[in-house]
């Protein structure tokens, strides 16, 4: 589902139904920041119920980890929320029944499988805010049923997005100052952490220093990026949530799930360096309350296709439309990241034009596998496919 469409509520309902059935639940998030946020929200959601909830992350002290391990093994913990720490060998569950994975494409298949194997007959719900077209979803997750939330929460306003050619904030600096003076908070997104001689791009460190100096004595500026330790990231995010920091300069580490309703303005430097779906994810961090959100895209790109793509974002804010456009102009590897997509380049097929064929083929494939294991049919064909796959072929002729 799209950014802010209510996926977490769907997960919460599933986790509660699982709890009522007497099973333990687990929710896995890709970052400690997001895991902590889920923990805080769900603890509040379930506070009226007799439900024991724990947060398990890699940065916990050994003593705290052991207490959680014991609670999971004895069954005194009903729901655990965490990062990859949830599927380590040292973690044992008494009766795990339901697993939720947030941001599906950020975890490897082996990681998801390891968590699912922590119990018998575990139900599995995976969620992603990258609203990929159904055809691509079926190709990536062909062994799962795919559901889409295509509506927005009532009353949520569209993000107003404006693209500026250049790398200066001057065109909207007055608006930014006025917004901050009214108590608002702002994200400033950069493609790099540090300056790179080979890449003439704005770095988070450089922009952080410039903004700290410019707004000194008026507003507090914070810095967030992937190279910080988890404790440092959590501290910066908490300060931003508590409005101790008014301007947060960051890389795309804030792309996933961060929720600060008071932050309703975002500036993205070198916007041409990001995929459209990635920018859509980023701007989904703002406008989460009842206030109007503003996103300013800065780019010095001179090529027309790049300009056209950024202008497209000014006019469109439906995540499914954007991802479809992104997929057509950049390809599936770019949409999800080459390492995550796991989708081979089709030698002949077209993921849009051949949707009906893809769905029909999927139905036949499921039937063939079922008949193979139940009746021994299609044995030669299945064995031939197994050999082809082992050789690493991207297609079968």
Give the location of each predicted region.
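Inter-lobe coupling/hinge segments of SF2-like helicase ATPases
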Residues: 1-311, 397
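Accessory helical-bundle/CTD segments and flexible terminal tails appended to RecA-like ATPase motors
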Residues: 238-247, 254-261, 266-269, 284, ...
């Amino acid at each position: 589902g799209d950014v802010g469409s209510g996926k977490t509520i769907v997960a919460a309902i599933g986790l509660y139904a699982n709890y009522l059935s007497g099973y333990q639940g687990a929710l896995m998030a890709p970052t400690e920041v997001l895991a902590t946020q889920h923990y805080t929200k769900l603890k509040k959601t379930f506070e009226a119920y007799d439900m024991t909830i724990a947060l398990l992350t890699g940065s916990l002290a050994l003593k705290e980890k052991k207490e959680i391990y014991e609670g999971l093994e004895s069954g005194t913990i009903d729901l655990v929320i965490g990062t990859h720490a949830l599927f380590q060998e040292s973690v044992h569950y008494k009766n795990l029944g339901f697993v939720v994975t947030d941001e599906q494409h950020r975890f490897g298949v082996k990681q998801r499988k390891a968590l699912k194997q922590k119990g018998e007959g575990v139900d599995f719900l995976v969620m992603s805010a990258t609203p990929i077209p159904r055809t691509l979803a079926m190709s990536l997750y062909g062994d799962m049923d795919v559901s889409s939330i295509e509506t927005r929460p009532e009353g949520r306003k569209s993000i107003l997005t404006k693209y500026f050619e250049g790398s200066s904030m001057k065109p909207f600096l007055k608006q930014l100052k006025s917004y901050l003076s009214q108590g608002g908070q702002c994200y400033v997104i950069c493609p790099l952490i540090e300056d790179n001689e080979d890449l003439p791009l704005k770095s988070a460190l450089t922009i952080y220093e410039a903004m700290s100096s410019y707004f000194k004595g008026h507003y507090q500026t914070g810095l967030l990026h992937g190279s910080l330790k988890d404790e440092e990231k959590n501290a910066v995010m908490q300060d931003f949530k508590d409005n101790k920091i008014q301007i947060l300069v960051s890389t795309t580490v804030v792309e996933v799930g961060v929720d600060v309703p008071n932050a309703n303005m975002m500036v993205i430097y070198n916007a041409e360096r990001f995929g459209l779906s990635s920018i859509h994810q980023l701007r989904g961090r703002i406008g989460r309350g009842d206030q109007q959100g503003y996103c300013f895209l800065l780019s010095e790109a001179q090529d027309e296709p790049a300009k056209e793509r950024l202008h497209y974002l000014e006019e469109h804010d439906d995540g499914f439309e954007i991802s479809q456009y992104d997929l057509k102009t950049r390809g599936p590897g770019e949409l999800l990241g080459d390492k995550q997509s796991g989708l081979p380049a089709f030698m002949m097929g077209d993921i849009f034009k051949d949707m009906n064929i893809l769905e029909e083929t999927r139905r036949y494939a499921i039937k063939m596998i079922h008949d193979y294991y139940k009746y021994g049919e299609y044995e030669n064909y299945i064995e031939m496919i197994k050999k082809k796959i082992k050789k690493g072929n991207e297609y079968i002729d």
